[in-house]
Amino acid sequence: MNINIMLKNKKKKFFSILAILFILMPNNSYASILTVFKPLGFIAAAIAHNVTNVEVIPPNGTTVENYYLLPFDLIKIKHSDFIILIGDQIEPFFFKKAVKYFKKKTIVLTKIKNIKFLLKHKSNFKKGKKKQKNTLQNKKEINNISYDMYLWLSPQIALESAIVIHDMLLKSMPQKKITIDKNLKYFKLCLSKTNKDIKKNVLSIKEKKYFTFHNTYKYFEKFYGLHPSGQFKTYPGIKTGVQYLYKIKNELLKKQAICVFIEPQFHANIIDFIIQGTNIQKENLDLFGTAIPLVQDSYVNFLVKLSNQYISCLKKI
């Protein structure tokens, strides 16, 4: 049997079984706003404070690319009122299929006009390149050009996302207009103050040299005026050859880096081996805010914590 036909039959059977399960299960209280990226949940929680629930799947500490939807996750999707998506193929395949299957209302951030103009082409962040205009002419362009999809690391995009969520809630729950408006106003004030504080705090480290793994922090770095000396596209794993490890070490020493930033899910002991015998420090950068709870001030706390992770490492030397 053709493999495509087999997969199609499996999907039909999968959703048919789920449909039966949902009919039999009680309609308990589930989140009204749902997303798969925790920092988007932070933004939603700020606007939905005392209005409605916000929930994030996958569970805390699990990366989206390594997570498979569970039946209970699909129940959450079924009972949610709104789904916040980034779009452009970044969400898990079956998550989007489930959202479409249950005909849920969605906010696709990359389709929002004011956000489209803030999207950055990956080449924008390379030194010596001519600055590209932040415009997207049509859907085809966003599908064919590689854009940085870690939108929540941009305070500007976060603000536009908050406005969209505000408008969505206002349309759905006009009786809670006072609270929803108050939440957006509070978010704007807190974000503005936080941005000023962070820009002031990073002044002392702006000229410090550092490396990151993967080009995932560019929105944040660009906004706050930080400039990495370079990035390593591939994080060394357990099976990585010694030659590549020494190549990384030589690059760090050549560029006189004083810090290398990694993500919590990486094997830190490999970096310890690379920087052994040098003055180079290492530090975690948590772009998902795994230890931050979903509360009204989560997003600004996330920005502060991320900036402090930069500062704590770069101020050591």
Swiss-Prot record:
Gene3D superfamilies for the chain: Nitrogenase molybdenum iron protein domain
Disulphide bonds annotated for this chain are: 259-313
Q: Does the keyword Plastid apply?
A: no
One GO biological process term is: zinc ion transport
Q: Which domain of life is it from?
A: Bacteria
Q: Which GO terms describe its cellular component?
A: periplasmic space
User: For this UniProt entry, which residues form the secretion signal?
Assistant: 1-31
Statement: the UniProt record of this protein carries the keyword Ribonucleoprotein: no
Protein name as catalogued: High-affinity zinc uptake system protein ZnuA
Biological source species: Buchnera aphidicola subsp. Schizaphis graminum (strain Sg)
The gene coding this protein: znuA
